[in-house]
Amino acid sequence: DCSSYRHNCVCLKIGEYYKLHCNDAIFTILGPDKDFYNTCIANSEKTKEKSSNVKCIETIKVNSLDKEEQYVPGEIKWPEIDSTSAINESSIVFLFEYEGLKILFTGDSGRNGLANAINFADSNSIDLSDTQIIKMPHHGSRHNIDIAFLDRFTHQNRTCYISCTKGDEGHHPSKRLINLLNEKGFKVLSTSGSTLHRSKNAPDRGWQVAKRIECYPTMEKLNL
């Protein structure tokens, strides 16, 4: 429905995608498209006949993160093929724009879902290269990200936000991913069980500046 919303918000359908204009802010839905979403739902662990296969895959992933290796700068190995659950792949990916700031929200999307969103942006002339902030999918899991996705972003002050619990609960975020993000020139910030705020021209409220996460000396091993 592209009717007008309250608070000066208007939804516009542009070709095959939607943009929500709310005052000076713009929200653009990049994915998933209908075909990709339907495929994800059909293959979801929440679809009864698929559940046993997906649970087996997820168990293997968790067990593969038990050991660590030393981090050697410039020599991070990264799997060419990796996957997450179908329900994660169905997450909405959208771009938020406000006064020159671009933030990409990725939900729990995996490699395929992100590629679907990137391809959609390219085909509709939506430039993502100058996005300043990227919310890393699925609490900073390495299974959801490939190097080609990270190489799309070239803004000088590019920053990654990771929403996760405090400490190393559940193996999130991935130390290997954090080290790779640093090598790719991203400033890495993590909630670690707290809340992060970003403000502009706001009065001092006594907040502390979020500390950048630097490279870890060790990281989880890969079973390549």
Locate each region found by the language model.
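Short amphipathic alpha-helical segments and helix-helix/interface helices
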Residues: 1, 147-151, 175-179
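Flexible, acidic/histidine-containing loops and adjacent segments that form or flank the divalent-metal
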Residues: 1-102, 182, 186-194, 201-224
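Hydrophobic beta-strand segments of well-ordered beta-sheets in folded domains
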Residues: 9, 25-27, 131-134, 156-164, ...
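Flexible, glycine-rich phosphate/dinucleotide-binding loops
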Residues: 36, 112, 169, 197
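Generic domain-boundary/flexible-linker signal
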Residues: 38-40, 145, 171, 199
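Active-site-proximal loop/helix segments of hydrolase catalytic cores
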Residues: 40, 71-156, 163
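A generic structural motif
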Residues: 129-138, 164-167, 188-199
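Extended C-terminal subregions enriched in glycine
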Residues: 136-142, 159-182
